[in-house]
């Protein structure tokens, strides 16, 4: 989700005025700086922040994927469209810096299930 939000050319921005232009990458870089994570540029700092978060998740016992929690693939895929719709309709979604398209939410769920990383150019088009 951090990589998704940090896009410098999102398909759709969030609805609040503070999201009138992409600046999330720079904000994540500020967090990395505050934590002393290093990096030569904002993208490198973002990757260092993600690495630190993943290390913390491992330390506290959060599994890497939805699949790792024993969720059956068939059941997951059967419920995927409903989960996407509920996530899209959730009141908090509009407060996200980057407002996701339903196809993007679906891809994020699939990535979370299979343990894939977000890559901007691999995101499905609406």
PLM regions with names:
Residues 75-126:
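Short, amphipathic C-terminal "tail helix"
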């Amino acid at each position: 989700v951090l990589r998704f939000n940090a896009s410098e050319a999102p398909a759709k921005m969030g609805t609040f005025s503070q999201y009138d232009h992409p600046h999330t990458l720079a904000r994540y870089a500020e967090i990395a700086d505050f934590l002393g994570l290093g990096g030569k540029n904002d993208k490198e700092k973002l990757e260092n922040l993600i690495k630190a978060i993943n290390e913390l998740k491992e330390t506290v016992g959060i599994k890497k994927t939805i699949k790792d929690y024993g969720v059956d693939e068939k059941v997951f895929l059967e419920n995927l469209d409903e989960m996407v719709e509920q996530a899209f309709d959730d009141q908090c979604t509009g407060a996200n810096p980057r407002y996701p398209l339903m196809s993007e939410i679906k891809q994020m769920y699939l990535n979370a299930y299979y343990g894939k990383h977000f890559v901007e150019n691999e995101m499905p088009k609406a």
